Regions:
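Alpha-helical transmembrane segments within multi-pass membrane transporters and channels
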Residues: 22, 55-95, 100, 136, ...
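Short, non-helical or kinked segments that cap or interrupt transmembrane helices
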Residues: 25-43, 82-92, 153, 177, ...
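Transmembrane alpha-helical segments in multi-pass inner-membrane proteins
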Residues: 186, 190, 196-250
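Membrane-interface helix caps of multi-pass small-molecule transporters
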Residues: 24, 49, 73, 77-82, ...
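Single transmembrane alpha-helix segments in multi-pass membrane proteins
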Residues: 3-54, 61, 78-81, 217-224
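Helix-loop-helix "hairpin" substructures at the membrane interface of multi-pass membrane proteins
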Residues: 126-209, 214
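Hydrophobic alpha-helical transmembrane segments
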Residues: 8-9, 13, 38, 58-66, ...
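Transmembrane helix-bundle core of multi-pass membrane transporters
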Residues: 86, 90-147, 176-177
Length: 250
């Protein structure tokens, strides 16, 4: 039982990064972005490609982050420039990225057990601690960003686009920023998941949006009276609780 809980916490920490990204689109921007189901495996495949080319795993994760952000921007282009509904724009991006992911490595799955991942790079540290540090850094950076002018305008865009326009700002810019950040985090989570598993698989993004939304709901439900916890903290705790419940149920 202890091993199940420990492994569930590890998975929860990985999924918490994805969940934080989903909070930005679904809760802050009220944008039903489905493209994370494409950018999650995109991050894994981009990482796998860079790693097998001999790139340092940390730099490979940065590439994954950038690839995911680009995927999010594609969704924005489809939504705003081509006037496609939000949910359909995300589905189109997800479908497009399925083909992209296959082309990156030329195979639906790729293993890299013979390559050094971030967990081998810092092998003196437990996997859980490495993931906890990464998650904490992301949380702190995002919390800081949301307190900046751009962060406040991102929050305002989700609440009232008219208000943002009255301030002389373009809400489209902040929708784009939100989608880029959200999908970049999804891709980073995918890269970490691939490293944890030792392989990337084309199906690893299927239904992850359901898991992420369930994590958000659980975090809000369990901690609805904990006003001292902000949205990113609740997302992290919700993801961990969800994975523990999921692990025990299996």
């Amino acid at each position: 039982m202890n091993s199940v809980i420990m492994e569930s916490i590890v998975m929860g920490l990985i999924f918490s990064i994805l969940t934080i990204g989903v909070v930005i689109t679904f809760k802050i921007l009220d944008f039903p972005d489905m493209s994370v189901e494409g950018t999650f495996p995109l991050g894994a495949f981009a990482f796998a490609k860079m790693l097998t080319l001999g790139m340092n795993p940390v730099l490979a994760m940065v590439v994954s982050l950038a690839a995911g952000g680009l995927g999010g921007y594609i969704t924005y282009i489809l939504f705003r420039k081509f006037k496609i509904q939000a949910i359909l724009a995300g589905i189109l991006t997800m479908t497009f990225l399925y083909s992209v992911n296959l082309r990156i490595t030329g195979t639906p799955n790729v293993t890299f057990f013979d390559y050094k991942t971030i967990f081998q790079l810092f092998e003196s540290l437990p996997k859980m601690l490495i993931l906890a540090i990464i998650t904490l850094v992301i949380k702190l950076i995002l919390d800081w960003f949301l307190k900046t002018e751009k962060g406040y305008l991102l929050l305002a865009t989700g609440d009232n686009e008219t208000l943002v326009k009255s301030l002389g700002k373009n809400p489209d810019k902040y929708i784009a920023i939100g989608l880029v950040i959200s999908n970049a985090l999804a891709a980073l989570a995918g890269a970490l998941m691939a490293q944890s598993n030792g392989y990337a698989d084309i199906t690893m993004g299927q239904a992850i949006i359901v898991s992420a939304l369930a994590s958000v709901i659980i975090g809000d439900a369990f901690l609805k009276n904990a006003n001292f916890l902000n949205r990113t903290t609740r997302a992290i705790i919700g993801a961990i609780i969800y994975r523990i419940i999921y692990g025990i149920a299996l």
